[in-house]
């Protein structure tokens, strides 16, 4: 009788836990320790500019923020992906979405997909004022710095 009672308790606890616990998503990048230059080299586009949100777009079951940019300088643009200077990023940071403060300058990099330009936390998207001076110097003075 005691054994049956323990079994019922364990089953009840497992049922309650399975209802309470939901799937959690987390952004994880691979490889995890890429340098700025490595991120720059694998991106389809890299530019310096100021972004502003122009809306939300749904693709499948995911929602994306659409940022458009006032571009100061283009460092890399494969396949003329910056003809339309806008890009999508996931609304959720747990899905590697990124945010840009309006009016601030950022280094922005990403990929051209069927849905348009995509940017995320695993690419080189960083406030320009946080980029080290030597990296800025290399980026501006060495045209090969971002090329594979």
UniProtKB/Swiss-Prot annotation:
PROSITE patterns: NTR (PS50189). GO terms for molecular function: metalloendopeptidase inhibitor activity; protease binding. Transmembrane segments: none annotated. Keywords: Disulfide bond, Secreted, Signal. Gene3D superfamilies: 2.40.50.120. It is found in: Secreted. Prismatic layer of shell (at protein level). Expressed primarily in the mantle with highest level in the mantle edge and lower level in the mantle pallium. Its main location: secreted. One of its GO terms (biological process) is negative regulation of membrane protein ectodomain proteolysis. GO terms for cellular component: extracellular matrix; extracellular space. Disulfide bonds join 27-96, 29-122, 40-146. It comes from the Eukaryota. Residues 27-146 form the NTR domain. The keyword Secreted applies. Residues 1-26 form the signal peptide. InterPro entries: Netrin_domain, TIMP, TIMP-like_OB-fold. The keyword Disulfide bond applies. This is NTR domain-containing protein.
